[in-house]
A protein has these predicted regions:
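Enzymes that bind and transform nitrogen-containing heteroaromatic metabolites
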Residues: 1-135
């Protein structure tokens, strides 16, 4: 599976059971990135996407168990460490700031297993700068 997630500058994901932020331009980038490949997510994340922009959107609260090789998973509030051996690639959309957080990204990107292979930057709708990192 290919993981897509949004993190702040300190790898924060959520605060008080809510996403830290969201951005409409980022969602457009996700739609272009996945193209016609299935994109899996849970019901919580699905509330910000629509099937018109992502025709192969699959919504299941057990999405990390359902996704197969080459399919994308948009992860906002789930631990990834139990699924790390099945993750082929990680795409992080990094906010240009730090938000309060009580849930953090639980994979160690500096452990030697993951290598940064590309970055790109773009202006979001509600963020001056969003950086896409691919591992």
């Amino acid at each position: 599976m290919i993981v897509i997630t949004c993190l702040d500058q300190k790898n924060g994901m959520m605060f008080n059971h809510r996403r830290q932020s969201q951005d409409s331009v980022l969602r457009e980038h996700v739609a272009k990135l996945v193209a016609n490949v299935p994109l899996w997510m849970n019901h919580y994340s699905a509330s910000q996407f629509d099937t018109e922009s992502i025709p192969n959107l699959n919504i299941d609260d057990a999405f990390l168990q359902e996704a197969t090789r080459g399919e994308y998973c948009f992860v906002e509030d789930a631990p990834l460490a139990p699924f790390e051996k099945w993750i082929e690639r990680i795409v992080i959309f990094r906010w240009d700031c730090t938000y309060p957080a009580d849930r953090y990204f639980d994979l160690q990107l500096g452990s030697g297993q993951w290598h940064l292979v590309g970055t790109s930057k773009f202006a979001g709708h509600s963020h001056d700068l969003i950086t896409m990192e691919v591992y």
